[in-house]
Amino acid sequence: VLLECGHIYNDTIAGAYVELARRFPQLTVRRLGGLTPATSEEKLLALAAADVFCSPADNLQETFGLSVLEAMASGLPVIASDWNGYRDLVQHGHTGWLVPCRDLLKTQSKPSALDQQFALGLKDYDSTVGLHSLGVVLDHQALEAALNDLLESPERCQAMGDAGAARIQTLFHWDQVCQQYRQLWKELNAIRLKHGEI
């Protein structure tokens, strides 16, 4: 069963799920949410029903990955693209699997033409994100291997889920986050006091 939970932003994306169900009749596709966002209750139900959380995101909008943290807090192993903030959350081989991807538009030595157009105000944010997404290639064989690994090994699935839940408690629990903010404020205040009023 493929359970999708979230917000389908347009009819094209909604149609892709219809096409998926048509092309793979042996696959049961269930969606929570849709053209309107899933409710908090629906999200909790989806996490409770899931065995694995998969987010093969391919765009710049996934800079942190709150949904990944929610899945880890729910004790689910995570399969996510090795992209932006996801790689800071998922420990490859320990709390889940990171699927390699490449940004075909990115160059090492200078900003891409697309990034330059955005910086100059010639492209808006939505267009830039959309066009960048077209240039990101996900390793589909690695995604398939990660899914098969977790589906064929309930023990590994459980161990990764447990490790993810522990990681959340250690690094991302509200008590930890508040303590880190307090420490940052103390450091910033010390810098301000050292340099005097501006």
Outline where the language-model segments fall.
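Short glycine/serine-rich donor-binding loops of glycosyltransferases
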Residues: 65-68, 86
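Nucleotide-activated donor-binding/catalytic signature segment of Leloir-type glycosyltransferases, i.e.
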Residues: 14-39, 52
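Conserved acidic donor-binding loop of glycosyltransferase catalytic domains
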Residues: 56, 81-82, 99-100, 105-107
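Short acidic alpha-helix that forms the nucleotide-activated donor recognition element
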Residues: 38-50, 73, 91, 109
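Acidic, amphipathic alpha-helical patches
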Residues: 17, 40-44, 86, 143
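C-terminal amphipathic helix plus adjacent low-complexity
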Residues: 116-198
